[in-house]
């Protein structure tokens, strides 16, 4: 009789535990609360484990009955906890959606329009002008060898012209190109004349940063090789380009020196009442052509180079090159 009472008592405790646990799980408000319930109900020291320890008072016939009932209660409580957790997640998502609901009657903030950077638009315009004159665009590596950047352009080692531009050397033989002229040499190695190309791209020089200098800037170089090309063709091409880009603006040519052209000239335009250098140019030195296996008696040509930043500054009356690189929207939104 005592065993029957013990069986009834244990079953009663299990039933009470199940009812109370069901209610607590349904009323739980958070994951952490559910985790605490799981530990207090089903943990090693939980209420279910405490009840099951009293099974030792039962006969071998009754113990399986309690064990089976306890196992069913455990499975049911685990399922209830999982279900309530999923319900809490769903409720949280619904609340977030409700809180973040967009009121379509509120005026939109709009999207700020984007535009090309002034340097990019300036370079694109320069390229378009020369393409209209029959030139094609060629590109080359920014990391160059000493040969392509200097020696192939009639600037051998220890030549005094190398003092004209400080260079970023990566090692004894590799450097960051100081001009885009190496593109012209690479192209001529694989393409016989006649040639009309332009080479746009970034170049690097060890200049101190100030209002008119930057260690990194953009350059466009021009190369024309054909029969019977002379300085008048160079002058005509440069004047046509400058008139197309700047409009009717005073231009002058000044004699100058470059190792890879002879004769050479610098080109100035009037800016704010003063002459400002904007291009360097000249007839390609026959030695440069001969090194490439090109007959300099049959083929002649001219080369010219310009800085995109300088052209952009003149076009838009910008007095400091550093403005191009500060990403100041107050400046950029003007273009």
From Swiss-Prot:
Keyword Ligase: yes
PROSITE patterns on file: AA_TRNA_LIGASE_II
Cofactor binding, note field: Binds 2 magnesium ions per tetramer.
Cellular compartments per GO CC: cytoplasm
Any one biological process term the GO annotation gives: phenylalanyl-tRNA aminoacylation
Top-rank taxon: Bacteria
Disulfide bonds: none
HAMAP family xref list: Phe_tRNA_synth_alpha1 (MF_00281)
Family: Belongs to the class-II aminoacyl-tRNA synthetase family. Phe-tRNA synthetase alpha subunit type 1 subfamily.
The name this protein goes by in its record: Phenylalanine--tRNA ligase alpha subunit
């Amino acid at each position: 009789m005592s065993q029957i009472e013990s069986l009834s008592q244990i079953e009663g405790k299990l039933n009470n535990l199940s009812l109370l646990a069901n209610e607590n799980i349904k009323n739980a408000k958070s994951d952490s609360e559910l985790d605490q319930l799981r530990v207090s109900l089903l943990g090693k020291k939980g209420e279910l484990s405490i009840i099951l320890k009293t099974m030792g008072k039962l006969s071998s016939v009754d113990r399986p009955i309690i064990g089976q009932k306890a196992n069913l209660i455990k499975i049911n409580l685990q399922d209830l906890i999982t279900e309530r957790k999923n319900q809490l997640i769903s409720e949280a998502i619904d609340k977030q959606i409700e809180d973040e609901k967009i009121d379509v009657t509120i005026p939109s903030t709009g999207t700020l329009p984007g535009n090309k950077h002034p340097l990019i638009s300036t370079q694109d315009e320069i390229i378009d002008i020369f393409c209209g004159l029959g030139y094609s665009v060629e590109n080359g590596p920014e990391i160059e060898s000493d040969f392509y950047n200097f020696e192939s352009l009639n600037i051998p080692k220890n030549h005094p012209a190398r003092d004209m531009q400080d260079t970023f050397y990566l090692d004894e033989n590799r450097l960051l190109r100081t001009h885009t002229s190496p593109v012209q040499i690479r192209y001529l190695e694989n393409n016989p004349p006649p040639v009309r190309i332009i080479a746009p791209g970034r170049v690097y020089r060890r200049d101190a940063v100030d209002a008119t200098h930057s260690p990194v800037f953009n350059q466009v170089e021009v190369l024309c090789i054909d029969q019977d090309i002379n300085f008048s063709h160079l002058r005509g091409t440069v004047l046509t380009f400058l008139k197309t880009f700047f409009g009717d603006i005073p231009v002058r040519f000044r004699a100058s020196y470059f190792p890879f052209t002879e004769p050479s000239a610098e080109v100035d335009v009037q800016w704010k009442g003063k002459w400002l250098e904007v291009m360097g140019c000249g007839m390609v030195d026959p030695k440069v052509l001969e090194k490439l296996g090109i007959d300099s008696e049959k083929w002649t040509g001219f080369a010219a180079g310009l800085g995109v930043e300088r052209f952009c500054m003149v076009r838009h009356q910008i007095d400091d090159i550093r403005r191009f690189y500060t990403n100041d929207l107050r400046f950029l939104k003007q273009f």
